[in-house]
Regions:
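A short helix->loop->beta-strand "cap" motif at the edges of active sites that frequently abuts
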Residues: 100-105, 136-137
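Rossmann-fold NAD(P)-dependent oxidoreductase module
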Residues: 15, 19, 97, 131
Length: 137
């Protein structure tokens, strides 16, 4: 399979990258800063790295259309007062571009939720989940 992996520079994404490659997949790693991403030489033949920003829809044309699945592991860890809005913009842009590819599966890592008592952080994760669920994958 050809799999798109966002969040490849994060802990979970970097661990998942190794698992996906070990299983024989070709992985397209999306990173905001290519200089911060240094995969081991042993897997470089199985990956493609593209630099883009899901807040900038003009960069998203770099995503290949022939992907089979996509992992959404992005998360805004910024202290910005509008991080919830930024996360929603990323999710909407992701949904739109992935819906235009051959991907049949989107895997999202959210959080454990108690919908009766959500922190601002978890409410944001829930909003991202709802946005991604609107996609046609």
């Amino acid at each position: 399979m050809k799999i798109l992996l966002t969040g490849a520079t994060g802990y979970i994404g970097f661990q998942l990258l190794h698992t996906l490659v070990s299983a024989g997949n070709r992985v397209v790693c999306c990173v905001r800063d290519i200089d911060r991403f240094s995969p081991p030489e042993s897997i470089k033949d199985s990956i493609e790295t593209i630099q883009l920003d899901f807040l900038d829809s003009d960069t998203l044309s770099r995503i290949p259309e022939d992907i089979d699945a996509a992992y959404y592991l992005m998360h805004s860890m910024s202290g910005s007062a509008n991080y919830q809005n930024l996360e929603l913009i990323c999710a909407e842009n992701f949904r739109k571009i992935i819906s235009a590819t051959a991907a049949e599966h989107v895997i999202y890592l959210g959080g454990i939720l108690n919908e009766n008592n959500l922190s601002a952080h978890l409410a944001s994760r829930k909003a991202v989940e709802s946005e991604l669920a609107k996609g046609t994958y």
